[in-house]
């Protein structure tokens, strides 16, 4: 083997190793706890809301329109209540985005999901009164979608994409590949995902994640 071939093989091996490491690092950066925030409410309970494993996969828009941004959202939101009366806690857990756009003429957002993609996390169905060892979750309905007009830009708008009723001292919700689009936006679009816990008493706490660029 000539010296030139040995050098060429060494360069290709180094390039492949660096590329593989880059892909592994990018995937690991979004695993685990992303962000959290706590609040002591009016009843001296500590309300904590968290975002886990957040990943927004921006894809080329199917309509091939330069003013459309399309993505799929996966992740989990969890809440913890500690203090007096935590077992009797009732409220709502919301997920959504802050959407920033530099210029637009009538921006619209669409977001949709199918019920098997929304899972109640940390729920125990093996104990009474359920006593179930396994569960199959068919679609409760074909899907749910929201549409909103964000108006003319530039601007920052906040949209709650879905919410679930929760009770007890802890719980969560998981979403996998929920579909979202923004139309009518010129330039880059930034999405900042959030999770919000709202108690039945009106107290609320919101945690915001890092912005995701949907160029």
UniProtKB/Swiss-Prot annotation:
The keyword Ion transport applies. It comes from the Bacteria. Keywords: Cell outer membrane, Cell wall, Ion transport, Membrane, Porin, Secreted, Signal, Transmembrane, Transmembrane beta strand, Transport. Disruption phenotype: Single deletion is viable, and shows no effects on glucose uptake. Its main location: membrane. GO terms for molecular function: porin activity. The keyword Metal-binding does not apply. Gene3D superfamilies: Porin MspA (Ig-like beta-sandwich domain), Porin MspA ribbon domain. GO terms for cellular component: cell outer membrane; extracellular region; pore complex. Induction: Not expressed in wild-type cells, it is induced in an mspA deletion mutant. Residues 1-31 form the signal peptide. It is found in: Cell outer membrane; Secreted, Cell wall. One of its GO terms (biological process) is monoatomic ion transport. Belongs to the mycobacterial porin (TC 1.B.24) family. Octamers. Probably forms a goblet with the wide end on the exterior of the outer membrane and a central channel. It is not known if mixed oligomers of MspB with other Msp subunits form in vivo. A backup porin induced when MspA, the major porin, is deleted. Probably forms a water-filled channel which favors the permeation of cations. There are about 2400 porins in wild-type, 800 in an mspA deletion and 150 in a double mspA-mspC deletion. A triple mspA-mspC-mspD deletion mutant has low but detectable channel activity. Different conductance values with maxima at 2.3 and 4.6 nanosiemens might be caused by a simultaneous reconstitution of MspB channels into the membrane or by the existence of different MspB conformations. This is Porin MspB. It comes from Mycolicibacterium smegmatis (strain ATCC 700084 / mc(2)155) (Mycobacterium smegmatis). The lineage of its organism: Bacteria, Bacillati, Actinomycetota, Actinomycetes, Mycobacteriales. The gene is mspB.
């Amino acid at each position: 083997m000539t010296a030139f071939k040995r050098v060429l093989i060494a360069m290709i091996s180094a390039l492949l190793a660096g590329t593989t490491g880059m892909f592994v690092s990018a995937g690991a950066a979004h695993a685990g706890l992303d962000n959290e925030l706590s609040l002591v409410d009016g009843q001296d309970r500590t309300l904590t809301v968290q975002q886990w494993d957040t990943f927004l996969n921006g894809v080329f828009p199917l309509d091939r329109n330069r003013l459309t941004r399309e993505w799929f959202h996966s992740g989990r939101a969890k809440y913890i209540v500690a203090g007096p009366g935590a077992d009797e806690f009732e409220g709502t857990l919301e997920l959504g985005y802050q959407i920033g756009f530099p210029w637009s003429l009538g921006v619209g957002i669409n977001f949709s999901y199918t019920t098997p993609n929304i899972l109640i996390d940390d729920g125990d169905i093996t104990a009474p009164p359920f006593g179930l060892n396994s569960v199959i979750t068919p679609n409760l309905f074909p899907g749910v979608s929201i549409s909103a007009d964000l108006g003319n830009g530039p601007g920052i708008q906040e949209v709650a994409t879905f919410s679930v009723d929760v009770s007890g001292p802890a719980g969560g919700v998981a979403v996998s590949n929920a579909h979202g689009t923004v139309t009518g936006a010129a330039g880059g679009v930034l999405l900042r995902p959030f999770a919000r816990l709202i108690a039945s008493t009106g107290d609320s706490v919101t945690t915001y994640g890092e912005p995701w660029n949907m160029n």
